[in-house]
């Protein structure tokens, strides 16, 4: 087991062979698999089949809740999460660019990267930023725990669903550990039913995944210039 502190560090560890199996977000998984030929997505959480990002806004903005992104946010300040985050950057950047016809750095007065979803929430809640992009699961968890001042910050828009986290394995593991090793790892992941283990991932179970599930993520990343 090799702990890492960021998506970028996880991708580097996978590329350099420090780890053969890793738990990635959708974007970091695409990035990592592209560095090692024949690498495969093996499994995803049941909850990862459909993930969402929320755009949240401080009350002072007067931005409206709607089915489309409120164009009145032009000229405001915006914070994403980690630069390599699927839910905290890639997906919201894609839809903001689609809505405004230009990249966020041209839409907003200032664009920041908080580093994580909890920090994004606090920055918008405090008014340090007008608007933020946050993983829906983090918002819902904090809301249920009573940790959000809903008089200060609210959800104004929800993205369409997209696939997110997954287990990915290097393409050279069968050569390194023996024929069929990758399949055995996949079977073990899908059979995981220990409540404590699943709770550590905030997942109810793992189900099969494959690279093609993340083709839309790859295309989106290419369109916004995050990968070649």
PLM segments and residue spans:
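Ligand-binding cleft/hinge of the Venus flytrap
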Residues: 72, 87-113, 141-148, 219, ...
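A ligand-binding cleft/hinge motif common to bilobed small-molecule-binding domains
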Residues: 23-36, 97-98, 123-126, 130-150
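A conserved helix-loop-strand patch within extracytoplasmic ligand-binding domains
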Residues: 45-101
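Ligand-binding clefts/hinges and TM-proximal coupling segments of bilobed small-molecule sensing domains
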Residues: 77-98, 183-228
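Short, glycine-/small- and polar/acidic-enriched structural segments
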Residues: 1-66, 136
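Hydrophobic residues within well-ordered alpha-helices
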Residues: 14-15, 73, 124-125
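Periplasmic-binding protein-like
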Residues: 45-54, 147-189, 199-216
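Short helix-initiation/N-cap motifs at beta->coil->alpha
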Residues: 1-12, 27, 103-122, 163
């Amino acid at each position: 087991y090799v702990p890492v502190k960021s998506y970028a560090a996880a991708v580097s560890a996978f590329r350099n062979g420090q780890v053969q199996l890793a738990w990635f977000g959708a974007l970091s998984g695409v990035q990592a698999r592209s560095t090692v030929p024949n690498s495969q997505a093996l499994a995803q959480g049941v909850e990862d089949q459909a993930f969402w990002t929320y755009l949240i806004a401080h009350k002072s903005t007067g931005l409206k809740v709607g089915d489309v992104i409120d164009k009145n946010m032009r000229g405001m300040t915006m914070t994403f999460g980690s630069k390599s985050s699927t839910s905290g950057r890639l997906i919201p950047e894609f839809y903001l660019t689609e809505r405004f016809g230009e990249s966020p750095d041209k839409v907003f007065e200032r664009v920041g990267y908080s580093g994580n979803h909890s920090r994004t929430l606090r920055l918008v809640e405090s008014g340090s930023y007008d608007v933020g992009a946050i993983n829906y699961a983090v918002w819902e968890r904090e809301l249920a725990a009573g940790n959000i001042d809903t008089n200060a910050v609210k959800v104004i828009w929800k993205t369409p669903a997209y696939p997110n986290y997954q287990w990915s394995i290097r393409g050279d593991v069968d050569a390194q550990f023996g024929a069929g090793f990758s399949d055995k790892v996949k079977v073990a992941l899908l059979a995981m039913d220990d409540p404590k283990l699943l709770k550590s991932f905030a997942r109810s179970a793992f189900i099969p995944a494959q690279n093609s599930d993340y083709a839309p993520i790859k295309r989106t990343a290419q369109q916004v210039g995050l990968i070649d």
